[in-house]
Amino acid sequence: MRRLTDDWSNTPDASVGLITTTLGASRRSPAALLLIGFVSGALATLTFHQGIIWVLSALGALQGSAYSWRPVEPFGVPQVLNLAFWGGLWGCVFALIADRFPRSWPLWLAGLLFGAIAPTVVGWFVIAPLRGQPVAQGFEPARMWVGPVINGAYGLGTAVFYAILQRWAWAGSRW
């Protein structure tokens, strides 16, 4: 998505650009941006995130199962749907900051780095202690690599779906 100023800064009459930007605002509203981010994140969880878990499990590099329907407390929601919900929320965060990455970066790279860093750091230093687990997987490299790999795949998928849905929703995406 282009920055607001990009829509009108190159027009000879700034007021014409401002009107165009205002008229287009309904399609580019924050709610629409968040919806695209949420759907992108949820779809990325169901495909890229769970897909890489399935591949790593099949290779024997990870103990766990993809697409688990095991109930998650406190509401008993199936794990895969719980993950898709949280992936959708992370997709909203990505949608809000996607335009802040350097313009020289491809969106897939921004998504990959976002996924590998943001959800992983929160998981290590916020979620794990709340669950009574060791911070950052106990700082054991043999266990630490899993988070950035799985979440990096998630971020890549979020960026892919974000670009597709953004183009579908409105023309003029920067990617």
Range-by-range predicted roles:
Residues 2-175:
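Juxtamembrane/disordered regions of integral membrane proteins
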